């Protein structure tokens, strides 16, 4: 039996459909959409850079449109979500606690995220900290005074911050909420009172099978080699997983133009029929975060979208090719470009410092309309009243070369 043959555009559209980025939202977002959208992606990576809206809020905005950013914080505080190390530090459904509990119980395998020597050296102080949380309730690292005021850099964290990070990685405490994006910790047994390790623990092998299932569903269409990166799995049993899921017809083989044979998750079978009939169309234009699942695996983004991306915020300014915090631009199924932007919150201006189009992308009327609306929506969501434009490709935004005002109801 011959494999279904898909164009590269169809493969991209199927992936974007799995990620919730194929079409513009048809309705106003609701509070319930926050955990639902994170479940769809499986993971929502956390990053603290706030040159524009912080990444987790932006990833949700790209899919949901205009929504109150505090909804993510509320979803965490209500216990619908949890934080832990997955792809990197991530929000995930709290029901997935079982998938990462084995990591908590072996923190010494977590590399730089857990320093056993530090935890042993400060054992008595850490025991006092645990007792303090037990007696006084949840804490932030900011609740404790730094003994070396003026120190800076992650390697000079105040001791209680390092203690809490270690306890977090070891699963002794969990994040129950964020206040001004600062973590608030409580003891794990109070956050998960019904959990019992002896009764409920899932083995690493079993957990990784479910992680591979989640990765396949969230990617929608994939090469086998793309799966492990989603949860940062080191040596998953990929061959056995693939054979089992193919036999169960939970994944099916397809042939994709330029990419060869890929796998398709069975959740996308209805869309596969539309793609084969030439009826699967991408209509969404959006500003993406550098930590969006669509681009967080740089090799996958290059293979699937022909989009080479590198985060340059840690690169010295003179050596940057594009800018400090460059945002990929999605338009109708393609990653058509990127922009270096900064939100000036005091003046209400979204500054587009520079914008670049991918090689071969023409500044058509449709492209200009889509990108202008995407940038306008992005600015409006951040309460901007104006967009200013710096360097742009020739022929793009010729009728508003220096920028435009924001209509609050746009």
From Swiss-Prot:
Keyword Chaperone: no
Keyword DNA repair: yes
Database matches in Pfam families: AlkZ-like
Keywords: DNA damage, DNA repair, DNA-binding, Hydrolase
GO molecular function, one term: DNA N-glycosylase activity
Inactivation phenotype: Deletion of the gene slightly increases cellular sensitivity to the cross-linking agent mechlorethamine. It does not affect sensitivity to the methylating agent methylmethanesulfonate (MMS).
Description of what induces expression: Constitutively expressed. Not induced by DNA damaging agents.
GO biological process: interstrand cross-link repair
Top enzyme category: hydrolase
UniProt cross-references to InterPro entries, sorted A to Z: AlkZ-like
Highest taxon of source: Bacteria
E.C. designation(s): 3.2.2.-
QXD (motif): residue ranges: 45-47
Function: DNA glycosylase involved in the repair of interstrand DNA cross-links (ICLs), which are highly toxic DNA lesions that covalently tether the opposing strands of DNA, thereby inhibiting essential cellular processes such as DNA replication and transcription. Acts by unhooking both sides of the ICLs, forming abasic (AP) sites on both strands. Unhooks ICLs derived from various cross-linking agents, including azinomycin B (AZB) and mechlorethamine, also known as nitrogen mustard (NM), protecting cells from the toxicity of these cross-linking agents.
Family (UniProt): Belongs to the DNA glycosylase AlkZ-like family.
Protein name: Interstrand DNA cross-link repair glycosylase
Gene that this polypeptide is encoded by: ycaQ
